[in-house]
Design a protein with these regions (language model features):
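Short, low-complexity, Lys/Arg-enriched N-terminal segments of secretory-pathway carbohydrate enzymes
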Residues: 1-14
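N-terminal active-site segment of His-dependent metallophosphoesterases
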Residues: 30-116
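Active-site glycine-centered loops adjacent to acidic/histidine catalytic or metal-binding residues
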Residues: 70, 129-130, 304
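Acidic/histidine-rich helix-loop elements
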Residues: 71-98, 210-218, 270-276, 330-334
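Extended active-site neighborhood of metal-dependent phosphoesterases/phosphodiesterases
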Residues: 41-57, 117-246, 339-345
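His/acidic metal-ligating clusters that form di-metal
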Residues: 109-112, 192-194, 198-201, 209-312
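Binuclear metal-dependent phosphoesterase catalytic core
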Residues: 14-55, 59, 68, 180-184, ...
């Protein structure tokens, strides 16, 4: 080190320090790679394996999402299945849910999983349902835990700001697990560093906490304000990007409890099975109007009602159930558990990939052949050539 400005500095101590720090970092990296955890005293400290970010479309110009709805995983082999045929019951446990999950990941090879997917090393995100806090953890603790798990891109809540009496202050958002994820264009394209598909995740709550209103919870006004802010921010980023004149990037939304308007889909030409009443809040908080006015959301993906797996359209926005996935949750004997797949496809330009051309969906059944059913186009870019 050099303390006298008149003397020539000796760089060797600094160089030695840098080499030492590099050695420590390399050692920790090797330990993490081999063992996945460090030990401090007698306690194992796990290091999160992070997903590769940003999420982006692959070289084939696609981005595939697996929606795992209502897994209801309990205690492994000790948890018996519900609503299966008599000959299936004696051997059916939570392990059937795990096996279905592994087989569907191998079959579909998704780029992203909406719920949970640590073993597959695929980026994943989770939203809370109405049962998740019924054990020893609060909803906030659960989302904190989920966000710290390997390959998770889940977030507890965003930091957002508002103004009160002319002063900028942090604005609280209801619920836990409200966040958005941006998916970038394919590597090598002019949109490689731009968000061209956006995913909104919302906490739809548990039971109503408002006196005089019974039933399920709902997406609150603070969450909808945040949604509108994010939507406008994405719009502003597009205007400043390399392709400001292209169609606004589409968005998809994920939350658990359906909104009241989903009941109206019984009277439409829905695709799939509508087998039980829509278990929604008795209070309508205006989510549908918010989504319509935002203009970017093309489809919403729901859970909660396990034997509904239909898609129906409301004011230009598709609402799709995932269908019950887990064997410990209720279902219907003889009706296979299922999973929803969502595929976004890019438009092919003269030299490279452009923006999103089409979004479609289908379901896979947990039968002998993972049957593919009810394929449906949800949105096509009107400006695609």
């Amino acid at each position: 080190m050099c303390r006298n400005k008149l003397r020539k500095c000796d760089p060797r101590p600094i160089l030695h320090l840098l080499i030492y720090l590099l050695f420590i970092y390399a050692t920790l990296l090797v330990i993490h790679t081999i063992f996945g955890r460090l030990f401090i005293g007698n306690h194992a400290v796990k290091i999160k394996r992070s997903a590769t970010l940003p999420l982006r479309f692959n070289s084939q110009g696609t981005f595939k999402i697996l929606q795992v709805a209502d897994m209801h995983f309990a205690n492994g082999v000790m948890s018996r299945c519900r609503d299966v045929l008599p000959f299936e019951f004696h051997y059916c446990t939570d392990l059937n849910t795990s096996d279905f999950f592994r087989r569907i990941v191998r079959e579909e090879r998704p780029d992203f999983i909406a719920f949970t997917a640590i073993e597959s090393k695929i980026p994943w995100a989770a939203i809370l349902g109405n049962h998740d806090q019924e054990s020893t953890m609060t909803r906030e603790e659960l989302m904190t835990y989920l966000s710290a798990m390997d390959y998770s891109v889940s977030q507890v809540n965003p930091v957002t700001y508002g103004y009160s009496d002319g002063e900028k202050k942090v604005r609280e958002i209801d619920g836990f697990g409200n966040y958005n994820i941006e998916v970038s264009g394919a590597i090598g394209s002019e949109l490689a560093n731009m968000s061209i598909l956006n995913l909104y995740f919302l906490d739809s709550g548990d039971r109503s906490t408002v006196p005089g209103i019974r039933g399920y919870g709902w997406i609150r006004e603070t969450q909808q304000i945040w949604l509108r802010q994010i939507s406008e921010m994405i719009k502003d980023k597009q205007r400043a990007g390399p392709a400001p004149d292209t169609h606004r990037p589409p968005s998809l939304a994920f939350f658990h409890i359906p909104i009241p308007e989903v009941r109206q889909l019984w009277f439409t030409k829905f695709v799939g099975q509508f087998q039980e009443g829509v278990a929604c809040p008795t209070y309508n908080s205006g989510v549908l109007n918010t989504l319509i006015n935002m203009g970017d959301v093309k489809a919403v993906f729901l859970g909660h009602d396990h034997t509904n797996d239909f898609c129906g359209e409301l004011n230009g926005i598709w609402f799709c159930y995932g269908g019950g996935f887990g064997y410990h949750g209720y279902g219907k004997a003889g009706w296979h558990r299922r999973v929803r797949v969502i595929l976004a496809e890019l438009e092919r330009g003269e030299r490279n990939w452009k923006g999103v051309h089409r979004i479609k969906t289908w379901k896979r059944l947990d039968d002998g052949s993972l049957s593919k059913i009810d394929e449906l186009v949800l949105w096509t870019n009107p400006l695609s050539t």
